[in-house]
């Protein structure tokens, strides 16, 4: 080959490589703006591995309510604008309801059977339809509220007799409600075996899904070929979590089937699903996962929010004082609050909404993925773009009248309704984004609203929450764990029962709940 021709070929290859380097990892001019990128990696080096919502909120202040990050050659759109959430993600939910593919989560752990990460399609629709039928508002009010009320009085009693383990009691409360409704198997105390297995599983899954815990194989598929020992044996660890997950779900399903074979059909969620198997024809692994997914979703969300609200109450005694006055005027000491008291206890509803806003359980909604190209405010979001809803950024919007960092329930004085009303309404009046957005909004929203009202109303009726020994760190970074869910680290708490009559009422109502409600269920 002639030297000149060889030189031309080499120059052409170099030019193509340079051009590719500047295209790969860079956004195009018709996309939303965002932080400066580097060739090949885009913005990967700038995305923190922990408390990502803090950085995303900083970028929103600089680049606006919709900006684009380049993750390798992939696209990530971050939405921190209430209008866009409604007009784009909600109203175009048919193309915004997909999930980004995850090799670790989809292929190694769940095999695509977990509703949280399940791709948008027929299986997802079947799961959502079955869940909706059992957790629609009318069903919750007619069948499930009595269980929630009973478990809430045990929650109060647990704080009374075992204040040392106050961080565990909300977990037992929410887990027992969910397991009773889904399987007919309640969690009688904080040492329940099913609950311990579940929280161990969720902790390990959360750890392996944290940014940086595994190689970025979804961005650079060639990294799957590298020996896994280079990355803490992530494949084996993920598969072990998957086995742990499937084993737990299957064990509990088998208990339901054994009970049914003995002639006991309790009308639980899984009883209804099994009754409809001739029509639904779910494979065995999907039967196990549909119940297990509900157990997961209902166990850690309400509990984490309850823990955050109790922390806020300790730090804001004036809020407690106002709540006590409202409850005393409506309820008194001879009974605890019930669901029917909701309209007469508006300040309790404000406290719960403020808890959702102040410390959202998911500061960043679980990522959506775009099913086709979309143009938003004149900017292109290509098909496959990962769409992140920055709940934290919207909740901490500095333009709101009151200090967003402060716990001020009164900011919701004009929001007397429950969250589903505002989620379906105008974006200007949305109360909070604690339950998600679009078609991926929490399917248990009606149950969760009742869980939270009865838990917080009864706890405030029963106790004055005082500081225990030691420091309370409510800082959104240093005071909170940041895994799958955003949860307060352990803090000291001293629940002081408000009077002798309330103490006697707690014991009386707990005895009634044990006899009339808890006796229906087995323990696990």
Swiss-Prot record:
Cofactors named for this entry: heme
EC nos: 1.-.-.-
Glycosylation sites: 191, 499
Membrane topology annotation: Single-pass membrane protein
Location in the cell: Endoplasmic reticulum membrane
Lumenal-side positions: 24-524
Any one of the GO CC terms: endoplasmic reticulum membrane
Keyword vocabulary terms for this entry: Endoplasmic reticulum, Glycoprotein, Heme, Iron, Membrane, Metal-binding, Monooxygenase, Oxidoreductase, Transmembrane, Transmembrane helix
Enzyme class: oxidoreductase
Pfam families: p450
GO biological process terms held by the UniProt record: patulin biosynthetic process
Membrane-spanning parts: 5-23
Cytoplasmic side: 1-4
Its job: Cytochrome P450 monooxygenase; part of the gene cluster that mediates the biosynthesis of patulin, an acetate-derived tetraketide mycotoxin produced by several fungal species that shows antimicrobial properties against several bacteria. PatH catalyzes the conversion of m-cresol into m-hydroxybenzyl alcohol. The pathway begins with the synthesis of 6-methylsalicylic acid by the polyketide synthase (PKS) patK via condensation of acetate and malonate units.
Protein name: Cytochrome P450 monooxygenase patH
Native organism: Aspergillus clavatus (strain ATCC 1007 / CBS 513.65 / DSM 816 / NCTC 3887 / NRRL 1 / QM 1276 / 107)
Organism ancestry: Eukaryota, Fungi, Dikarya, Ascomycota, Pezizomycotina
Gene: patH
């Amino acid at each position: 080959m002639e030297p000149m021709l060889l030189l031309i070929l080499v120059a052409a290859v170099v030019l193509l490589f340079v051009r590719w380097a500047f295209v790969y990892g860079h956004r195009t001019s018709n996309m939303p703006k965002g932080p400066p990128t580097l060739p090949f990696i885009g913005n990967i080096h700038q995305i923190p591995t922990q408390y990502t919502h803090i950085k995303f909120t900083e970028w929103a202040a600089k680049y606006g309510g919709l900006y684009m990050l380049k993750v390798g050659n992939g696209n990530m759109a971050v939405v921190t604008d209430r209008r866009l959430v409604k007009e784009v993600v909600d109203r175009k939910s048919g193309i915004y309801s997909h999930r980004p593919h995850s090799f670790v989560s989809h292929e190694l752990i769940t095999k695509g059977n977990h509703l949280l990460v399940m791709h948008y399609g027929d299986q997802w629709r079947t799961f959502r339809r079955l869940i909706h039928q059992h957790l629609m508002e009318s069903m919750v009010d007619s069948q499930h509220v009595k269980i929630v009320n009973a478990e809430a009085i045990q929650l109060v009693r647990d704080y009374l007799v075992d204040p040392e383990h106050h961080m565990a009691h909300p977990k037992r409360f929410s887990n027992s409600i969910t397991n009773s409704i889904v399987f007919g198997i309640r969690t009688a105390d904080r040492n329940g075996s099913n609950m311990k297995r579940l929280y161990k599983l969720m902790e390990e899954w959360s750890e392996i899904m944290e940014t940086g815990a595994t190689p970025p194989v979804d961005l650079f598929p060639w990294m799957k070929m590298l020996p896994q020992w280079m990355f803490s044996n992530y494949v084996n660890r993920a598969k072990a979590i998957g086995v742990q997950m499937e084993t737990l779900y299957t064990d509990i399903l088998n208990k339901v089937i054994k009970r049914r074979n003995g002639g006991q059909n309790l009308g639980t969620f899984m009883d209804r699903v099994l009754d409809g198997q001739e029509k639904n024809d779910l494979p065995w692994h999907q039967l196990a996962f549909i119940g297990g997914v509900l157990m997961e979703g209902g166990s850690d969300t309400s509990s984490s929010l309850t823990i955050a609200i109790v922390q806020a109450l300790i730090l804001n005694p004036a809020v407690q004082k106002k709540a006590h006055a409202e409850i005393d005027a409506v309820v008194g000491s001879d009974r605890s609050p019930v669901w029917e008291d909701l309209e007469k206890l508006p300040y309790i509803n404000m406290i719960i909404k403020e808890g959702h806003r102040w410390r959202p359980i998911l500061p960043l909604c679980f990522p959506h993925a775009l099913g086709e190209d979309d143009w938003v405010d004149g900017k292109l979001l290509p098909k496959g773009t990962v769409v992140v809803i920055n709940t934290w950024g919207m909740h901490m919007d500095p333009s709101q009248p009151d200090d967003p960092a402060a716990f001020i329930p009164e900011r919701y004085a004009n929001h007397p309704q429950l969250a589903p009303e505002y989620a379906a309404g105008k974006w200007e009046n949305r109360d909070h984004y604690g339950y998600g957005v679009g078609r991926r909004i929490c399917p248990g929203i009606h149950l969760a609203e009742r869980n939270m009202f009865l838990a917080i109303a009864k706890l405030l009726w029963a106790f004055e929450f005082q500081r225990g020994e030691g420091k309370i760190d409510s800082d959104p970074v240093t005071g909170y764990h940041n895994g799958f869910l955003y949860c307060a680290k352990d803090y000291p708490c001293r629940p002081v029962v408000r009077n002798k009559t309330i103490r006697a009422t707690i014991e009386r109502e707990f005895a009634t709940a044990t006899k009339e409600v808890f006796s229906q269920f087995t323990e696990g």
